[in-house]
Amino acid sequence: MIESFSFGSYVIVYNGQIYNTKELTKELKKNDFEIKTHSDTEVLLKSYILYGKDVVNYLNGIFAFAILDTNKKEVFLARDHFGVKPLFYTNVNNTLVFASEIKALFQYPGVERVLDSQGISELFGIGPAHTPGTTIFKNIHELKPAHFAIFNESGLHIKLYWKLKSKKHLDSFEETCDKLKYLLKDSITRQLVSDMPLCTFLSGGLDSSIITKFASDYCKDNGLPPLDTYSIDYVDNDKNFIKSDFQPNSDNYYIDLMTKNLYTNHHKIVIDTPELADSLEDAMIARDMPGMADIDSSLLLFCKNVKKEMTVSLTRRMCR
């Protein structure tokens, strides 16, 4: 959901969630900023006013945002560390046009729908992966993860603000387990703060099971209702499932194991093959490009069904 907010000569448009809003709010109040809403959009904008372009070094979350400074006649754009939130842009006659979806850019007069040969080659060769910053359309770019950009009269200037560093691992096995547990719990519980109905996707795999475990424990420990969890299945999958080295058991075995032992309210969404086929084009349109076919259509149908009851879901998904 895109949020907007203005303060003085500054205007922000923002998509995402900041997980350390409380810490940022404390610092803002120390510096005589008044916070009038419960929105992280206000906190983000006023943090930018306080820290300038260095604000990205203080953010813990997933985000893509743009801030206009009408006094400086300057736009500041930034994307989160791992590129969870998308941000695309193009330049038309020295005018910066940006959006969370490529299709939105084409609504601006002068933005042409021309395929890029290099982008198409990557689509067929390594798709859905691609070279960071590129798309399948000419002159349509994505702001790379962990980058910010400044657009003013001198043009567009892009800079890397963070890079994952490799360090020698010196901790013992026990210390490693303790640290990993702490980091996972901290990360997951921070993301459980939501004004909207929240759930987790549960496939029975390691990632979704870990997320669901910590999230359900949080609900139980804080006297909240059981955590809603969702999984996907297919008509006649129980009859047609074939074991392999890659998948020796059906997902349902592990899903049932988790839901029986955790504080959850589980929902299973069952999809039929014709639905998958009928949704292939819709899934491609949603992505703005061809993707992983049946996987994308499954995810689209799954999310549409979950959206009937939920707004926010914690899940492990590949960044775009």
What are these regions (language model features)?
Residues 1-286, 299, 303:
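Cysteine-centered catalytic environments shared across enzyme families
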Residues 279, 293, 301-320:
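Active-site adenylate/phosphate-handling loop in enzymes that bind or generate adenylated species
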